Regions:
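Rossmann-like NAD(P) dinucleotide-binding subdomain of oxidoreductase/dehydrogenase enzymes
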Residues: 55-182
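Glycine-rich loop-to-alpha-helix module at the N-terminal edge of alpha/beta enzyme cores
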Residues: 1-54, 64
């Protein structure tokens, strides 16, 4: 229900969110209104559907392939994203975290925090306190703080190879998984 409510909030505020996203990163309003904002809402709806799957079910997909569905929340996920798709990237990262029953600390790009901060404001009454946390600031300070913090059970990063290497090393030192889009 929460993910569908988030999608509805995005739909209800699509013009406003598209304007904020365009002001935030300079992308043409025609793109944010026609692509970024609707795709974000669709992404929350998609994951709302995913969590309807039967927990613990098993399917034989082929001679040597068995598919198992288990729900095992991993814990707090630290996520760091780049400047170019701030709102859509937030949807891509947040929807699966919520669907899996986890919490996140979401670090925006220091140059494009506005649309994610506005999104967080709009959904604050739908998402329980402490589940979706947004931090801003320079990557060398707030991003590094996340990499050094012992409370994360997974790290996710989208951006440069150089920083991605640092994220991978931080995850390896903690023996936690990392998702890297470089």
């Amino acid at each position: 229900a929460v993910l569908n409510k988030i999608a509805a909030i995005i739909d209800e505020n699509k013009e406003h969110l598209a304007m904020v996203e365009s002001m935030d990163n300079g992308k043409p309003i025609r793109e944010t209104l026609a692509v970024d904002i609707p795709m974000a809402a669709d992404h929350f709806r998609y994951f709302a559907g995913c969590i309807q799957a039967e927990e613990g079910s098993a399917n034989i997909l082929g001679k040597d392939t068995l598919s198992l569905i288990l729900r095992e929340p991993i814990g707090v996920v630290g996520q760091i994203v780049p400047w170019n798709f701030p709102f859509l990237m937030a949807a891509w990262k947040l929807a699966p975290v919520l669907a899996s029953g986890c919490c996140t600390v979401f670090k925006t790009s220091s140059t494009t925090p506005l649309s994610v901060l506005e999104f967080a404001r709009l959904v604050q009454d739908v998402i329980p306190a402490g589940v979706f946390n947004v931090i801003t600031g320079s990557g060398s300070k707030s991003g590094q703080y996340m990499l050094d913090h012992p409370g994360f059970r997974k790290l996710a990063f989208t951006g440069s190879t150089e920083v991605g290497r640092n994220v991978a090393l931080a995850a390896a030192q903690k023996l936690i998984p990392a998702t890297l889009e470089l």
